Amino acid sequence: KDFLKINCQLDELEKTLNNFIYKNQLNKTVFKDLSSLKNLSRLNSKITFSTNFGRDIEYYSGVVFEIYSSSNKEIARGGRYDGLLKNLGSDKNISAVGAAINLNNLKI
């Protein structure tokens, strides 16, 4: 329940997750995939990390994301879809990342 309350800026993510891990006596390797997100903090953008996505995300298998403009309009959303094709009947288990871009909210 507390995990779904995590909401922080990307540069605070490591500290926030470490506090959560310590408080809940978890193994740190649970969040090893999230460490690669630290590289995104080099971008000159405000990036917020939240564990409460608020959508039906059963077909996602890993990190799920949403990208918003400075005026709070959704620009894109997506995530990892490992195993989705196999669940849909494929003989192969294919790893994938996908996103949908909302072209109406892009400024050109």
Question: How would you name each of these model-derived features?
Answer:
Residues 1-108:
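Positively charged, Gly/Ser-enriched RNA/tRNA-binding surfaces
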